[in-house]
Curated annotation (Swiss-Prot):
Protein name: KH domain-containing protein At4g18375
InterPro entries: KH_dom, KH_dom_type_1, KH_dom_type_1_sf
Superkingdom of the source species: Eukaryota
GO molecular function: RNA binding
Any single Gene Ontology cellular-component annotation: nucleus
Coiled coil: none
Record key words, sorted: Nucleus, Repeat, RNA-binding
Length: 606
């Protein structure tokens, strides 16, 4: 009897073990299902047609293909939105072709990818019809592809990508991520951008071939499928390598110990220490907080910055003889400018009061005070390249500015406009009108572009700036001691001397040699200088030993500081026996603060 009970107990244990083993096998089989992920970029001006009213279009694609599709929100400064398409595949096909067979997608995710591309093309053509833009026969498609899949796509000695080009007759390029390209902002650090262009059918065939290779090759990178990971942009700020440990934790990327930025060092007091948890997505762990200098990095929306945004509208005049260069064949040029800048650009072919030989280009951009780059500035600069002749040494740009806000460009007694003239060497003339005033900027290309940046940024500051706080903000006190970080926690900077003598040297009307007639604005208009930042320029002393670090190889570091901050930076010749230099910063308060902090970060790394 005892043996029978033991035998029954053993049988019962074996049956339970078998059941658990079956569950584990079933669970492992589910986990072994391979994930196929595609990420296609959709221009922001056509994404509405891809989603459809109440999600009708995108939901229909989900229903018909059974694939998972997520449309992520637009990142600030990005001209594209990411559409992620994925599905699970139990057994992948061993043999795949490079040409699309009708109704034979390799998986439901690839089927959905092709249908999403069709929706993008249809929405783009619908927009062109509404705006009366000539139809462009060539189409373009962009995919985000990780490094591991990109290498397989290219193949040995470019064999695979050459075969795709030859069979589909489409242009297929694998482009590395460019932080200066607005369409690459949404790409991860490990991403390349695959650009496919050509005739519609050729692009679709090439898209099938590229996605077929991605179907066969599993990525080694961990591609996030949730919006929280996707919405964290990659760091686009270039900081000195000596400071990298203070910004990033030691997780294998930066292993060197930083002996400069220890507690007790002469660090300016406004460098607020933060923990890595404030930068989620940049680090693997954030258990141990490390000092992160917040003010050395530009504040971007989403990391505690202001969420308030306003719509900016700029009117640019273009001669009728050059308007086709701006639009391009089938609207290709203006479409490219829209995508590169992220702005909405419309051409109004109605004649202006300035003359019958000009038309108005309207640039509209929704921006926040915390945006790192201005979409409006990018659009105006890109338009300048096409409005003027390519080989012209001297160019001219004309803006229509509302009479209500022109004061922020002129300044009190013309102080601001004269300073822009002085700093950029551009000829700037403002003619008065009933509603809009004509701002004409002429001179060398570099001078005109610098002047346009200053004018557009001041108009932007007038719209986005906090008028209450700006009006009550006081300029920093002037000091004759310019010692920089010499045992003190305060940065040594002074107000430049030209600010005090600006009004007396600019003439009565503030326009120098420009006459103040009925059609030219003088100093008598009701312009409020209180809406401008209190300080329009700032001087920083750069020690001689830190000059090479601030400049960088070939001036690369200084150029990055200019690009990131948006401020104008001029380095004057050495005026002291120690070989120190003066950096003159000009721009809005936020731009100067950002540039100042970046310069100081490089100085501290020496």
């Amino acid at each position: 009897m005892v043996e029978r009970k033991k035998r029954k107990q053993i049988q019962r244990n074996n049956s339970e073990s078998n059941r658990n083993q079956k569950r584990r096998i079933s669970h492992d089989k589910i986990n072994r299902d391979e994930l196929v992920v595609y990420r296609i970029l959709c221009p922001i001006d056509v994404v509405g047609g891809v989603i459809g009213k109440s999600g009708k279009v995108i939901n229909a694609i989900r229903h018909n293909t059974k694939a998972k599709i997520k449309v992520f929100d637009q990142l600030h400064g990005c001209s594209q939105r990411v559409i992620t398409i994925y599905c699970s595949v139990k057994e992948k096909q061993e043999e795949i072709g490079f040409t699309k067979s009708e109704n034979e997608p390799l998986c439901c995710a690839q089927d959905a990818l092709l249908k999403v591309y069709d929706a993008i093309v249809a929405s783009d053509e619908e927009n062109n019809t509404k705006t009366n833009v000539d139809r462009d026969d060539n189409k373009e498609c962009r995919l985000l592809v990780p490094f591991s899949q990109s290498s397989s796509l290219i193949g040995k000695a470019g064999e695979n990508i050459k075969r795709i080009r030859r069979r589909t007759r489409a242009s297929v390029k694998v482009v590395s991520k460019d932080v200066s390209d607005p369409s690459h902002v949404c790409a991860m650090e490990y991403d390349n951008v695959v650009v496919i262009s050509g005739e519609p059918e050729s692009v679709k065939q090439a898209l099938f071939a590229v996605s077929a290779i991605m179907y066969k090759i599993n990525p080694r990178e961990n591609i996030p499928l949730d919006s929280t990971s996707q919405d964290v942009p990659a760091a686009s700020v270039i900081v000195p390598s000596d400071l990298s440990n203070s910004v990033y934790p030691q997780t294998g990327f930066y292993s060197n110990q930083d002996h400069i930025l220890q507690q007790g060092a002469g660090v300016p007091s406004y460098f607020n220490a933060l923990s890595v948890s404030d930068f989620q997505g940049y680090a693997e762990t954030a258990a141990n907080p490390v000092p992160v200098f917040a003010s050395s990095l530009p504040v971007t929306h989403g990391f505690g910055g202001s969420s308030r945004s306003e719509e900016l509208v700029f009117k640019v005049l273009c001669p009728l003889c050059n308007i086709m260069r701006v639009i391009g064949k089938g609207g290709s040029t203006i479409k490219r400018i829209r995508e590169a800048s992220g702005s909405c650009i419309e051409v109004n072919d109605s004649r202006t009061k300035c003359g019958d030989d000009e038309c108005v280009i309207i640039v509209t951009a929704t921006e926040s005070p915390d945006d790192m780059k201005s979409m409006a500035v990018e659009a105006v600069l890109l338009l300048q390249e096409y409005i003027n002749d390519e080989d012209a040494e001297n160019v001219k740009m004309q803006l229509l500015v509302s009479s209500k806000v022109i004061g922020c460009v002129i300044g009190k007694s013309g102080s601001v406009i004269n300073e822009i003239r002085k700093r950029t060497n551009a000829n700037i003339c403002i003619s008065k009108g009933k509603k809009d005033d004509l701002v004409e900027v002429s001179g060398e290309v570099s001078s005109v572009r610098d002047a346009l940046i200053q004018i557009v940024l001041r108009l932007r500051e007038d719209v986005l700036g906090d008028k209450d706080s700006v009006a009550t903000r006081k300029p920093p006190a002037r000091t004759d001691n310019c010692s920089f970080l010499s045992g003190s926690s305060n940065a040594g900077y002074t107000l430049p001397s030209f600010m005090s003598s600006m009004a007396s040297t600019s003439g009565f009307h503030g326009y120098g040699s420009f006459p103040a007639g009925d059609n030219v604005l003088g100093s008598t208009g009701p312009y409020s200088y209180g809406r401008l930042p209190s300080s329009s320029a700032l001087e920083i002393l750069i020690p001689a030993h830190a000059m090479s670090k601030v400049m960088g190889k070939g001036g690369g570091n200084l150029e990055n500081i200019r690009r990131i901050s948006g401020a104008m930076i001029e380095i004057s010749a050495s005026k002291t026996s120690h070989g120190d230099h003066i950096a003159l910063l000009s721009g809005t308060l936020e731009q100067m603060r950002c540039a100042e902090n970046l310069v100081q970060a490089f100085v501290m790394s020496t």
